[in-house]
From Swiss-Prot:
Keywords: Cytolysis, Hemolysis, Signal, Toxin, Virulence. Coiled coil: none annotated. SUPFAM superfamilies: Leukocidin-like (SSF56959). InterPro entries: Bi-component_toxin_staph, Leukocidin/Hemolysin_toxin, Leukocidin/porin_MspA_sf. One of its GO terms (biological process) is cytolysis in another organism. Belongs to the aerolysin family. Pfam families: Leukocidin. Residues 1-25 form the signal peptide. This is Gamma-hemolysin component B. One of its GO terms (molecular function) is toxin activity. Toxicity requires sequential binding and synergistic association of a class S and a class F component which form heterooligomeric complexes. HlgB (class F) associates with either hlgA thus forming an AB toxin or with hlgC thus forming a CB toxin. Interacts with host AMFR.
Length: 325
């Protein structure tokens, strides 16, 4: 089969877009609010909300930490976004002869957006910068009067004045975390993207790697292999975990609410995976690979109402979106 014909045919096909919005079908649970009085000034209110997309194998676990501080003129909400995003990996057909393909999890996106007026703003977040470490770890600390600190590690930077702390800890082997370009006082987002992938000691390779003869050798097992196309990919267990299995995100955002503003506001939390199409073909002399970015996208959004006065949240809506090239 000719790869160029297949790609042209795929691109020529109109984009498939399916929007599903139905809160009744979403599996959402919200725990009762727990209250912890730190001292005569600070009280903490905590609740956890979960929402799942069984179809996309995406789950959101959101921990809402409300901080009521009498020494500060604003309400503070520390939101931890955790859960699971499946890679969507689709293995090759071992019977494919001279052409074969896989779909793999190339990038994961998480964003938090404040759907309100200027009374609610995003004032801090973690991670704050690009990170290429194997394991990302940050600790957020809140001290009296609204001071927020974010440090590397799981406990660094805290002191005796810390009234509240929260941590994030996730693994991203061969991937890197970047901050979304549209991060501002209303939105914050992160992308965890395949960055430096090794192939049996060769590489590193990325989504855009290219060799003038062999193309992108990201997951190609052998240039001169006599195996069928469907058996000439590197073994699944040799691929990075995030490319073939699941990503377990953990991100933090801090929202500030002006006390003379509206008592309720809305936020939208978005989890998304981008799947690339990776192909190999035999041209009669050697094998060559090609990677096509963002060939399939699966997005799961949940919208919550935030009750700042009673320190509660309510799931308003969920939406599943498919985007196929």
């Amino acid at each position: 089969m000719n790869m160029n014909k297949l790609v042209k045919s795929s691109v020529a096909t109109s984009m498939a877009l399916l929007l599903l919005s139905n809160t009744a079908n979403a599996e959402g649970k919200i725990t009762p609010v727990s209250v912890k009085k730190v001292d005569d000034k600070v009280t903490l209110y905590k609740t956890t909300a979960t929402a799942d997309s069984d179809k996309f194998k995406i789950s959101q676990i959101l921990t809402f930490n409300f901080i009521k501080d009498k020494s500060y003129d604003k309400d503070t909400l520390v939101l931890k976004a955790a859960g699971n995003i499946n890679s969507g990996y689709e293995r090759p057909n071992p019977k494919d002869y001279d052409f074969s393909k896989i779909y793999w999890g190339a990038k994961y996106n998480v964003s938090i957006s404040s759907q309100s007026n200027d009374s609610v703003n995003v004032v801090d977040y973690a991670p704050k910068n690009q990170n290429e470490e194997f394991q990302v770890q940050n600790t957020l600390g809140y001290t009296f009067g609204g001071d927020i600190s974010i440090s590397n590690g799981l406990s660094g930077g805290l002191n005796g004045n810390t009234a509240f702390s929260e941590t994030i800890n996730y693994k991203q082997e061969s991937y890197r975390t970047t901050l979304s370009r549209n991060t501002n006082y209303k939105n914050v987002g992160w992308g965890v993207e395949a960055h430096k992938i090794m192939n049996n000691g060769w590489g590193p390779y990325g989504r855009d790697s290219f060799h003038p003869t062999y193309g992108n050798e990201l997951f190609l097992a052998g240039r001169q292999s006599s195996a069928y196309a469907g058996q000439n990919f590197i073994a699944q267990h040799q691929m990075p975990l995030l490319s073939r299995s699941n990503f377990n995100p953990e991100f933090l955002s801090v929202l500030s609410h002006r006390q003379d503003g509206a008592k309720k506001s809305k936020i939208t939390v978005t989890y998304q995976r981008e799947m690339d199409l990776y192909q190999i073909r035999w041209n009669g002399f050697y094998w060559a690979g090609a990677n096509y970015k963002n060939f399939k996208t699966r997005t799961f959004k949940s919208t919550y109402e935030i009750d700042w006065e009673n320190h509660k949240v309510k799931l308003l809506d969920t939406k599943e979106t498919e985007n196929n090239k």
